[in-house]
Amino acid sequence: MKKIILIGGGGHALSVLEMAEDLSLFEGYADLQENVDMSIPYLGTDEEVMANYPAGEFQIHHTLVYAKDVNLNLRQKMIQKYAAYEKATLIAKTACVTPHSRIGSGTGVFHGVIINRARIGSNCIVNTGAVIEHNVHAGDNVFVGPNATICGGVNIGNNVLIGAGAIIRDDVTICSDVVIGMGSIVTHDITQTGVYVGCPAKFVKSI
């Protein structure tokens, strides 16, 4: 198995290492600077990693998450930057992913997650304690926050952030490039890109 390089060395990268448990899986991490809290080697900037660690010999896992000023395109640009590399899928031992579920390449599934006969795209993050029910189809680069609940039959586009504790009602469709605020409840289809918050969730601003 090819060793994994984490792209990013911030707080989420620390969570990935805790979730994976076996540090021998990792070659190290790339970032603009070293983080002394990381327990794997610092390999340099993106440019240094791509020059010294060939795509054919290593796989990567993206750990960049969204900051307060949510920029959905930033993570997508980083994914494209490393397009030549194989993407490592990481699933915590304590997660429950049923046999008929499908998890895309580069996706991370964290502790206590339940995924029940759902399809999750590539380069997604399903964070601690989230529940994704039957017949959910999530696209690529989707972030599901801690303890969020996505009920059965929901369809989610690409580049979507669902905040911690949010609830998506069954059979709802959410288009691409959408942010659902923490604790919000989505009761109807979302067909316009933007930020939605509240109970029920309502459009508050463009991205």
Model-identified regions with their sequence ranges:
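Structural signal for interior beta-strand "rungs" in well-ordered beta-sheet cores
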Residues: 89-204
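Short, well-ordered secondary-structure micro-motifs
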Residues: 39-41, 100-101, 207
